[in-house]
Each structure stands twice: as structure tokens, then as C-alpha cells.
């Protein structure tokens, strides 16, 4: 079971048993807080024996001797502390969280000698702890060692010692909102597909109303009235009805244009008639990672009271093979009026997105549109699971996204767009076809979407490699990563809040 933390901040802490976690700069002799937590200086001998050099994220676990103010001391190396950035502080928090087990309380000393760890560092450290503590264990029936008889997790009381308590508390309120948004996105991706269909997903988004988000849910009938033939074509093979969810957060000025985020929400993707291989198909419960990220982002923006008008639109469908399913060779008419020849029913995400993009642009006239989608396997071939693909018709927006990715370490790599690629999706029988063939697959998918954004600044993030099954690290031990929530929150915070 996952560990839960009750985190507080203090300038000093009275030590009386429990765990002390001390950060150690590779360039200093003693760890932070050593004078109070380790008066006997047992660290010096332990470090010498273990050849501990305080390399970044390395650790030394010490049982405190009789008479010590704490029961146990864990020293975590920071490397050269003067070089730490915001993401490094997140990772240190995650490393600390991973080592807190079987204790009721922990004091964490982060104010390194010669490197003042102010409120921002403390809040980032705490955010890293919250992100690392997450695990998806809803369907596990066996209790962990730290659980009570009812299976409830006993929270560990954590005090982070920092010289700037007021700033840490203020910034941590926003950090908690970010953590909650990421965790919501992770939960949605991790849920089994028999539990989370389009209707159930829409209900999860509807719950954001308690935070002040306005939520509308369009049914199949309403989408048909709007002419969303591309989205509805994907859904027609499933007994589960599709939904289009519109979330509005009005935190900016009354007449200020909103920023808009659109997510692909294929709650399960068999591939349809162009069916996928059986091996690994269970992972297609995560094919709604884009919609999950948008929902998590809207939670974060509302929970922290972001001073921006933001729109989140998610298209929710299930792609199933059935006697009524869409066929290769079908031609559908999108909301834009453009016709699409279906070449491969497994290239369905772009069909969902094209109607959602057109609807968003037509109704809200946003400053920009950013869509997120687990869209192509081709982006995995190109970038692996370390970076998401970025496609954009606007250099300023692309640069802002790239910069936000560097801050949050949710990194993006810009991919090309161009007329020669666009020609690859021309059709003999319709305005376009839904796949351009084997080569340049992630690019032709982006070119397809570009046909539905008109002149609005737009970016497409292909997160197929980063939303699920990505490399585990200090702040994520989950299959569903929640990729995109922190990235887009940073984008909004730095560039678009009034």
C-alpha cells in the first residue's frame, strides 16, 4: 500500500525519537541538521566505512546509538548542492519518500551549509514526496504492514525544516494542487477498462465542479446534431456511448480569451476492425492518457486558483470490433465539413481529436489550442519514452512549451510539419484519409490534426511514450505517469496568468 504523509514546515523541530533525514552536500563535511540529529557524529564513522561521498540521490541508513534524539538517521546525497535546480529538489523529495517506512514521524533537514534552501526548495521537495508516495492499489485486497486493521493507511507526520516557513507554506498550497492533478491523471490511466468507460470518465470530470469548474457533457445525440461524424464513427462499434466533456475554469478577466487544452480519450482501444495483436492489448486501457492529463490539469488550475480562463475538452469513446463497427473504406464527415476516408480503424485517435479541436475553436475562439494524445507508435520509435513529440504551427507557443518541459523535466522534442508530409494524407475518394502509411507516421498524424485548427496557434503533444509505461524514477513509480499536468501548469503559470 502507498505511504501517506502529513507534511508541515518549521524553522526548528524538537527531536524525540522517530526518523531524521539529513541532506548532504558533496562539498561539505557535515549533513544539514547534523548538530541536532546526530550529536555523537555517528555519521562520520558510518560514511567512512561505507565510503559514502554524497553522490546525488545516494543514501546512508544509520541506526542511531543509545541516547540519540532520534531512532534512525538517513543521509541523502545531493551531489554539488549549489547546482540543484527545481527538478532536482523534486527528486530529492522523492528519494526521501521512498525511504520512509515503518515510522510514525520524520524530521527532514534540507538547509544545507552554504546553500540556503528557501521556501521554493522546501515546497518542491514536498511535492516530490507526494508524487513518489503514489501507488495504484485500489484493487489489491491484502493489507500492507503500515495499514490498520481496516486497511487504512496511517499517515506519517513529516516536518520539513526550512528557514523560510511562510514562503514554503504558501508555495506548498500550489504544490498540493499540482500533486492532486497529477495523481488524478495517474488514477484515470491506471483504472481498468471494465470500470472506466466514457460515461464513468465523464462523471470523474463532472466532479471538478466542486472546485468551481463548469462542466458540460454532450451525449451522442447532441454530438450527432453538431455533425461530429469522425468521433462518432469511432464509437459506433461499442455498446458504451461516447461523451464529449467541456470543462471551463474562469479564473481570469471576464473578456479575456481562454487557453484551451484538448485530450484524446479512447478509454480502450482494440484497434477496431483493424484489430491489434493480442499481446500487450491490455495496455490500451491507457489510450486515454491525453484526456486524463487535461482533466488533471483542469483540477490543478482550479485547485490553486489560477488567474486564467482555461478550457478543457475531452472526447471519450471506446474503439471496439462489432457488426456495427466502422470499416476500412468508410468515408465520414467531420464537424468541419471535411470528409475522411478510413484506411485503418486503429488510427482512431485523430478522428476523435479532429471534431474536438474544431468544436473548441469554433465555440471558444481561444488564444491557443494544445492537444494531448497517445496518438502513434511511431513517436515511440523516434523518441522512446523519455520525451514527447511536439508539433506546432506557432514558434512562440512551441518555445514556451519546450521551456516549460525543461523546468518540469517533462521534456518535449519538436518534430517537423510541412506540405510534403501533408500530401501523404490526401485521398482519392475524400478530402483526406486517416493514415498516411508506414513512414513518418507521427508526422502525418499531426498533419491530419493541423487541417482542423485553421489559423489558431496550436500544438500537438504525442505522449504515447510518456503517458504510460515510461521509465520509473524518483517521483513516479506508477504505470500511468500523469505526464503533461506539471508541464502545462508551468506553461500557464509562466506565460498566461493575468
UniProtKB/Swiss-Prot annotation:
Listed GO cellular component terms? cytoplasm
Q: Which residues bind Mn(2+) 1?
A: 269, 346, 348
Query: Could you give the cofactor binding note from the entry?
Result: Binds 2 manganese ions per subunit.
Q: Which Gene3D superfamilies has this protein been placed in?
A: Leucine Aminopeptidase, subunit E, domain 1, Zn peptidases
* Keywords, ordered alphabetically: Aminopeptidase, Cytoplasm, Hydrolase, Manganese, Metal-binding, Protease
Q: What class does this enzyme belong to in the EC scheme? A: hydrolase
- The entry's Mn(2+) 2-binding residues are 264, 269, 287, 348
Give the reactions, separated by semicolons, that this protein catalyses. Release of an N-terminal amino acid, Xaa-|-Yaa-, in which Xaa is preferably Leu, but may be other amino acids including Pro although not Arg or Lys, and Yaa may be Pro. Amino acid amides and methyl esters are also readily hydrolyzed, but rates on arylamides are exceedingly low; Release of an N-terminal amino acid, preferentially leucine, but not glutamic or aspartic acids
Q: Which HAMAP family has this protein been placed in?
A: Cytosol_peptidase_M17 (MF_00181)
Q: What is this protein called?
A: Probable cytosol aminopeptidase
> What species does this protein belong to?
Rhizobium rhizogenes (strain K84 / ATCC BAA-868) (Agrobacterium radiobacter)
The lineage is: Bacteria, Pseudomonadati, Pseudomonadota, Alphaproteobacteria, Hyphomicrobiales
Give the gene name: pepA
Amino acid at each position: 500500500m502507498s505511504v501517506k504523509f502529513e507534511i508541515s514546515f518549521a524553522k526548528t523541530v524538537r527531536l524525540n525519537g522517530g526518523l531524521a533525514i539529513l541532506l548532504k552536500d558533496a562539498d561539505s563535511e557535515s549533513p544539514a541538521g547534523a548538530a541536532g540529529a546526530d550529536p555523537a557524529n555517528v555519521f562520520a564513522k558510518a560514511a567512512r566505512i561505507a565510503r559514502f561521498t554524497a553522490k546525488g540521490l545516494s543514501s546512508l541508513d544509520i541506526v542511531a546509538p543509545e541516547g540519540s534524539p532520534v531512532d534512525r538517521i538517513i543521509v541523502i546525497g545531493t551531489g554539488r548542492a549549489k547546482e540543484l535546480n527545481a527538478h532536482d529538489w523534486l527528486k530529492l523529495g522523492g528519494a526521501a519518500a521512498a525511504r520512509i517506512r515503518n515510522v510514525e514521524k520524520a524530521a527532514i533537514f534540507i538547509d544545507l551549509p552554504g546553500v540556503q534552501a528557501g521556501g521554493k526548495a522546501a515546497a518542491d521537495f514536498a511535492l516530490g514526496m507526494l508524487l513518489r508516495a503514489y501507488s495504484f492499489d485500489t484493487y489489491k485486497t491484502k493489507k500492507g504492514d503500515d495499514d490498520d486493521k481496516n486497511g487504512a493507511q496511517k499517515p506519517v507526520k513529516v516536518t520539513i525544516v526550512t528557514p523560510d516557513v511562510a514562503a514554503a507554506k504558501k508555495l506548498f498550497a500550489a504544490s498540493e494542487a499540482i500533486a492532486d492533478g497529477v495523481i488524478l491523471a495517474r488514477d484515470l490511466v491506471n483504472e481498468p477498462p471494465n470500470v472506466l468507460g466514457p460515461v464513468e470518465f465523464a462523471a470523474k470530470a463532472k466532479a471538478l465542479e466542486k472546485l468551481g469548474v463548469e462542466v458540460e457533457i454532450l451525449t451522442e445525440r447532441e454530438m450527432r446534431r453538431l455533425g461530429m461524424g469522425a468521433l462518432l464513427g469511432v464509437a459506433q462499434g461499442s455498446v458504451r456511448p461516447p461523451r464529449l466533456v467541456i470543462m471551463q475554469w474562469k479564473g481570469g478577466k471576464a473578456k479575456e480569451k481562454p487557453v484551451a487544452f484538448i485530450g484524446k480519450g479512447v478509454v480502450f482501444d482494440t484497434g477496431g476492425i483493424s484489430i491489434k495483436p493480442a499481446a500487450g492489448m491490455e495496455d490500451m486501457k491507457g489510450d486515454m492518457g491525453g484526456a486524463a492529463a487535461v482533466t488533471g490539469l483542469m483540477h490543478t488550475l482550479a485547485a490553486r486558483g489560477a488567474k486564467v480562463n482555461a478550457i478543457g475538452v475531452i472526447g471519450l469513446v471506446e474503439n471496439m470490433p462489432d457488426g456495427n463497427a466502422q470499416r476500412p473504406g468508410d468515408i465520414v464527415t467531420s464537424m468541419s465539413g471535411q470528409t475522411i476516408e478510413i484506411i485503418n480503424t486503429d488510427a482512431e485517435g485523430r478522428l476523435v481529436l479532429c471534431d474536438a479541436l474544431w468544436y473548441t475553436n469554433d465555440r471558444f475562439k481561444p488564444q491557443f489550442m494544445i492537444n494531448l494524445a497517445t496518438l502513434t507508435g511511431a513517436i515511440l520509435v523516434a523518441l522512446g519514452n523519455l520525451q514527447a513529440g511536439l508539433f506546432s504551427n506557432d514558434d512562440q507557443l512551441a518555445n514556451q512549451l519546450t521551456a516549460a518541459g525543461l523546468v518540469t523535466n517533462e521534456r518535449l522534442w519538436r518534430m517537423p510539419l510541412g506540405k510534403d508530409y501533408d500530401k501523404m494524407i490526401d485521398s482519392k475518394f475524400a478530402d483526406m484519409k486517416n493514415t498516411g502509411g508506414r513512414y513518418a507516421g507521427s508526422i502525418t498524424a499531426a498533419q491530419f490534426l493541423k487541417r482542423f485548427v485553421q489559423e489558431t496557434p496550436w500544438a500537438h503533444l504525442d505522449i504515447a511514450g510518456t503517458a504510460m509505461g515510461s521509465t520509473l524514477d524518483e517521483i513516479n513509480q506508477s504505470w500511468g505517469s500523469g505526464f503533461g499536468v506539471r508541464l502545462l501548469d508551468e506553461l500557464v503559470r509562466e506565460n498566461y496568468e493575468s
